[in-house]
């Protein structure tokens, strides 16, 4: 996962620049992607400026469900699911690292392979909203 870490480091400056701009302009912001490494600095800066910030890692614990989701995604992408299926070990290693980082950072961790878990996203948003109101 070293190349994943390198890519996270490379995009980090752009992520912080996007956050700074949104704070200056007072606009809402949703940042998502596999190259956003769970990090409390991202959330802390947003909260210090009076905003609501929530870090969430979405994962799929069951590998067969994960593969099925990748195949389903192919309908909406120009990329073949084979590209992802052939790299499933690497993808799951990256996912495992992200899940491990939620334990350090306190980010929410939701298994989207489970319908009940996916419903928890609203719960986490409500908790964050209520913490400042």
Q: Model-derived features: where do they sit?
A:
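Hydrophobic helix-cap positions at the C-terminus of alpha-helices
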Residues: 18-22, 46, 102
